[in-house]
Curated annotation (Swiss-Prot):
Keyword field contains Cell wall biogenesis/degradation: no
Record's keyword terms, sorted: Cell projection
Name of the protein this chain belongs to: Intraflagellar transport protein 43 homolog
A GO biological process held by the record: cilium assembly
Location in or out of the cell: Cell projection, Cilium
Length: 200
């Protein structure tokens, strides 16, 4: 601003227009928005700062259905340890999935192995309850879900806090009695505890 003192018709000051400098505007983003920006910066990075995180592949062809299915398979990052072994495993899984016999192993369709076939294959390894039933062509996977694999014993009464406390107390008493019956172990343990306490 320039202040004028002697002119009566004009106000006491006037605004002088500055010529635009070649360096551009001076401000926070002045250096970034120049015609020749700093290397690595552009006006696009200001509007979309996260685009550098997601790199595009070099493929610019149209995608087909096969490409879409291949891209849905997850792959570990390249800096992952044992990358070669993991990628080999992924490739082998992909190859095995394309195998024609995959449908037989698919859990949705089931193995379709019946008890008659399974008895010859597995022999005595079948569940012991299966010999008591004539099930014919029932799927083995269904039987595995319906029959328990362990013998279950029902408790005489319902569990309560008192019954749990009593059973725990009886176990502790039994362990103490067993410990008294084996004096050599308890003496060596007491000797070790005495030795450790005397050191520290």
């Amino acid at each position: 601003m320039i202040i004028l003192e002697n002119e009566a018709n004009e106000p006491g000051f006037r605004i002088q227009q500055r010529a635009e400098s070649e360096t551009g505007k001076k401000g926070r983003f002045g250096g970034i928005l120049k015609e020749n920006p700093i290397k690595g910066f552009s006006s696009e990075t200001l509007t979309r700062p996260l685009t550098g995180l997601f790199r595009k592949t070099g493929k610019s062809q149209r995608k087909t259905d096969d490409d879409d299915s291949q891209e849905t398979i997850a792959a570990p990052p390249t800096n992952f340890p044992n990358m070669a072994r993991i990628s080999a495993t992924i490739e082998s899984v992909q190859i095995n999935d394309e195998y024609a016999g995959y449908r037989d192993r698919n859990p949705e369709t089931g193995s379709k192995l019946t008890l008659n076939e399974g008895a010859g294959v597995f022999g005595n390894a079948m569940h012991p309850l299966t010999r008591y039933f004539k099930v014919g062509d029932v799927d083995v996977s269904i039987l595995g879900r319906s029959f328990p694999t362990e013998k279950t014993v029902d408790e005489e009464g319902p569990w309560t806090a008192q019954s749990l406390f009593n059973s725990l107390e009886s176990r502790i008493k039994k362990e103490r009695i067993d410990a008294k019956d084996q004096p050599s172990d308890s003496r060596s343990r007491n000797a070790r505890e005495t030795l450790i306490s005397s050191k520290y």
